[in-house]
Amino acid sequence: MIQQESRLKVADNTGAKEILCIRVLGGSGRRYAGIGDVIVATVKDAIPGGNVKKGDVVKAVIVRTKKERRRADGSYIRFDENAAVILRADGDPRGTRIFGPVGRELREKKFMRIISLAPEVL
């Protein structure tokens, strides 16, 4: 469950290490975002020579959350950290690699490029 001012780890190789959520997209009063939701964020920490730099405003999709999420079959999924993947304007990931597992909810939200790059889909 991600809201404004939440900090997330970046799970790709764009050069950003940490981002801060500044808006949850999808409705005027939307407060929380979960796995598969798109947010607007700013880069808070980045490595030198990366594709993005500190202060850049980016769109990102959430791939892991600490807050458990109930699935249709009654099971729950949760991760050890909050993480996101930075997106281009067309919705594809900006990086070429994804680190760590991602939630199956991304498949239902049509983020197939992220699913194919991820080492594990839970």
UniProtKB/Swiss-Prot annotation:
Give any single GO term for biological process: translation
Write down the species: Kineococcus radiotolerans (strain ATCC BAA-149 / DSM 14245 / SRS30216)
A Gene Ontology cellular-component term: cytosolic large ribosomal subunit
Ranges in a coiled coil: none
The coding gene here is rplN
PROSITE patterns for this protein: RIBOSOMAL_L14
- Which Pfam families does the entry link to? Ribosomal_L14
**Which NCBIfam families does this entry report, sorted A to Z?**
rplN_bact (TIGR01067)
| Recorded superkingdom | Bacteria
Q: What is this protein called?
A: Large ribosomal subunit protein uL14
The GO molecular function terms of this record are: large ribosomal subunit rRNA binding; structural constituent of ribosome
